[in-house]
Amino acid sequence: MNYRGIYRRRYVFVLLLLVAVVNISYGWTVLKNKDYKRRYLSPSGVEKVRKHLSRKYVASRNNTQTFKKHYFSNTWAVHIDPPDNDVADRIAKKHGFTNIGKIGNIEGHYHFKHEEIGERELEKARHKTALLNLEDEVKFAEQQKILERVKRDGIPNDPYFKDMWYLLNTGQASGPAGVDMNVVPVWKKNITGRGIVISVLDDGLDWTHPDLEANYDQTASIVLNDNDNDPMPRDSDADNCHGTRCAGEAAAIANNGICGTGVAYNAKIGGVRMLDGQATDALEASALGFRGDHIDIYINCWGPKDDGKTFGKPGPMAAKALRLGAEQGRNRLGSIFVWATGNGGLTDDDCNCDGYTTSIFTISIGCIGDHGLSAYYTEKCSSTLAVTFNGASHKEGRENKMVTTDLYHQCTEEFKGTSASAPLAAGIIALTLEANPLLTWRDVQALIVHTAQITSPVDEGWKRNGAGFHFNHKFGFGRLDANAMVNAAQSWKNLPAQRKCTAASGFDHQDIPRGDSLFINIPTVACESSSAQIAKVEHVVLTVSFVHRRRGDVSIDLISPKDTKSQMLSPRKYDDSDEGLDEWSFMTVYNWGENPKGIWRLKITDNPNQDDVMNLFNGDNTDDVESLEERVIDTQTKQNKAEWEKMRKENPYFDVPYPTGVRKDKVLGSTEINDNSFDTPHTETFKIIRNHIPEVNLQNNDNMNTLNFDPVTGRKKNSINKKIINSRKRNFLTFRNFLKKSKKVQVQQEETGTQRVQVNAGYENPRISCESGYTTCSGVLINYKLTFYGTGE
């Protein structure tokens, strides 16, 4: 056989094949390069690429795009009319779906799931949506977007500690004795939450925990992520402990020698597993509307990111579920939705940017530490109703421990954030509902307003509204007092039916001056001479739309006819968005009890260079009032402990009497400030000062600046400080002019130079067109609407 000829032919064949491949590759490269040059190297192509990259970067900085890997779920919300489960099953089967069931308590709305549609099969999903919408019985079908939701316990953990100082504070923590929730007197009345059902909407509930099992309620539990009835968390992931920890604070069993004690330790507890997976509007609506005929209180310790730049609110179905829960839940008395305000204080976040906490149907709960002072990550806003305790201190560093149940049948003292505060509030509300089961959802809120106690009394943020109620944007109406709330509930008369009055609206575009304020007077008769007339307001909702060069520079204040000021939006240094807001509803509870008739004032301010303002007026040498109070409290605590130790040596049976804490026994009248206004054993220093305070009227908050003495703190105002402040203001104005010049140069460089991968907060948005025709505005107010909720005469 001629092997040499065979090898030669094979060699020639391989050589020809390689030549062909090289030629084809070269030709393809030429065509590709020509196409590349035609598409991308032309001036218009380069500009398109630049704008595309710029948009992507701005979107990532402003958090306006959701993570795209899981943007759509494989579930649909389908509205079928007339509502019929058999029709829903037929339509679902016809198009390859599975009918999971009704969406919460919304009539005619069904949850469909398609197992064969992947997360990136958008065309196939659109085709399925179109087919569903062609059905005669289908009013609408919508594929569900996946919403990003985060748990609110992201605070560093601490070593183990067994004493629950927030339930009975005898001085075992670093703070003073008596600063607690005053829950022991309620337990002594045999009020322990019996007959009340609480459900935790979270990442699951380890109901087999020996400190929870006897109180577990299967009817109040479900798994919405997997359509199951067992809410056991996926304990392979240690982060899925959040719901179990919330449950333990509210309803852990007492007197069983295990872990700690829940506030309402005889209440029933359930869990809705909804955070262990993809969140959608339909899923949230299902959770918020789940078994409203059986569940009394829903604990919610989740929401949009606390990053200081996000605006997030319930979707249309979740918002409707909240409303229907308030209208129809608990046999039409109204479901109680307790919500944690968030932990975004370190990023200057504002809880009014969270549409869940600003809903009139939710009870927004903030947090304080063992000294009764605000936590270092506290968010301030006008929708906060009250505060309870958690392990945080006023300054970052020292932490106290919170005892609760944990995964693997363990006990932990490492629960932090407002997630540790909201379950305590839910427990107190459970005690209140046992004392009076006929309370409506509005009655519960009103009881909080009437009975919450002043905490951190020297804080200068305490004001009094036109109806005589104290409030503070850090603390709401104050710290929840279980005993005071239960006592008031036992003789409480239900509020009259709620009324809604759309008081005023404006649709004329108005400029927001650069570095200045837009003032709008809003006269209203509060729907006088109609069935919607309101004489006592409860919730005030301000809905606004505006565009602005930098949303984080905008602050919004609303002043009532009684001169009560609510900051509806505060500046946020990390919010670089230039998109403004579209029909965003801010809410305040701080006009509670006022007659809304009169002239309301709306103030919208552009606050450029807010960081420089804070540095000038709050330098390192400036002590905040709460830090000073903390040092005074610590001194008094040490003295008290020394006296107690001495008495124990003289009398071995001596025990510390139950302390009164920082409480007010009633809502003070406008001239009732006296030595007993803030009854606390460790504030003698402040009482000495108050001995010299003349009687003052707190009703007009704007006139308080003219007094020589601050009526809330009892401290003499220092005229030297005014000189210092005026000097700092002059320095600031000079510095701001310098920044304006620097900013102008920087803008010119950005416009004429190469695009940098950086978003500067000071850049002007070329899309904003000032109504005045000049370029002196920072933004434009598009419209506003003022809505009152309350009662008539």
From Swiss-Prot:
Pfam families (UniProt xref): P_proprotein, Peptidase_S8, S8_pro-domain
GO cellular component, one term: Golgi membrane
UniProt keyword annotations, A-Z: Cleavage on pair of basic residues, Disulfide bond, Glycoprotein, Hydrolase, Protease, Serine protease, Signal, Zymogen
Tissue specificity annotation: Predominantly in the body column.
Keyword field contains Cell inner membrane: no
Any single biological process term in GO: protein processing
Gene Ontology MF: a single term: serine-type endopeptidase activity
Glycosylation positions in this chain: 62, 190
Record domain P/Homo B: where: 495-638
Residue intervals of the Peptidase S8 domain: 164-486
Enzyme Commission (EC) number: 3.4.21.-
Coiled coil: none
InterPro entries in UniProt: Galactose-bd-like_sf, Kexin/furin, P_dom, Peptidase_S8/S53_dom, Peptidase_S8/S53_dom_sf, Peptidase_S8_Asp-AS, Peptidase_S8_His-AS, Peptidase_S8_Ser-AS
Prodomain residues: 30-152
Function field: Probably involved in the processing of hormone and other protein precursors at sites comprised of pairs of basic amino acid residues.
Similarity annotation: Belongs to the peptidase S8 family. Furin subfamily.
Protein name, entry field: PC3-like endoprotease variant A
Organism for this UniProt entry: Hydra vulgaris
